[in-house]
């Protein structure tokens, strides 16, 4: 994203490793553009006391609890910083005033298209590939995840236990 655009409409913010950008149960008020860092999106199930990682984002991506942001409802997921983040944020109200700008409208449509395509690809992957195939795909197409994310989060992202991931890794390596 162009730095001039970011500086004009967005505010620079920093988050430390382990910090929650968005907390489940709170309404999302900001759209973030990750300039640097890594975050994970996860759901926490209090009945099983288990976290499930559903997405991992790196630099140069937009980040928010989209449903909460749009519907003004408490977020069902949390967004946690895995590697220190530098981001640019814009509030909901300010964002709405920008939508009248044709250039920004093009950006918003691009963001929505990107989010929808990623969601559909992720769903297809989980439904059509085995955990081992998903892990091999990550190794080939997204090695940043393997290199930068703790194995317990990778296992959760794939939908398996850490022990099952360990067995997959032994077979591969």
Spans of features found by a protein language model:
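Cyclic-nucleotide recognition modules
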Residues: 53-111
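Short proline/glycine- and basic residue-enriched helix-capping loop/turn segments at helix->loop/beta transitions
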Residues: 1-17
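Glycine- and acidic-residue-biased ligand/ion/polar-headgroup-sensing regions
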Residues: 18, 29, 33-41, 59-60
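Phosphate-/nucleic-acid-contacting segments
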Residues: 129-173
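Short phosphate-coordinating micro-motif centered on Lys-Gly-acidic
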Residues: 21-26
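Short beta-strand segments in beta-sandwich/barrel cores
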Residues: 11, 38-43, 62, 86-87
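Short, Lys/Arg-enriched N-terminal segment that forms or immediately precedes the first helix
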Residues: 115-124
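Interfacial loop at the N-terminal end of multi-pass membrane proteins
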Residues: 42-56
């Amino acid at each position: 994203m162009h730095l001039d655009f970011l500086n004009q409409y967005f505010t620079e913010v920093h988050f430390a490793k382990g910090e929650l950008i968005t907390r489940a149960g709170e309404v999302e008020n900001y759209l973030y553009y990750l300039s640097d860092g890594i975050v994970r999106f996860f759901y926490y199930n209090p009945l099983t006391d288990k976290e499930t990682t559903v997405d991992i984002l790196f630099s140069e991506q937009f980040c928010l609890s989209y449903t909460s942001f749009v519907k003004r409802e408490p977020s069902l997921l949390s967004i946690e910083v895995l590697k220190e983040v530098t981001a640019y944020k814009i509030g909901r109200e300010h964002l709405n005033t920008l939508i009248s700008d044709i250039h920004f409208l093009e950006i918003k449509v691009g963001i929505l298209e990107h989010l929808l395509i990623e969601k559909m690809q992720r769903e297809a992957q989980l439904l059509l590939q085995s955990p081992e195939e998903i892990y091999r795909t990550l190794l080939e197409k997204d090695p940043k995840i393997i290199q930068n994310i703790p194995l317990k989060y990778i296992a959760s992202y794939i939908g398996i236990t850490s022990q099952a991931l360990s067995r997959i890794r032994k077979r591969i390596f």
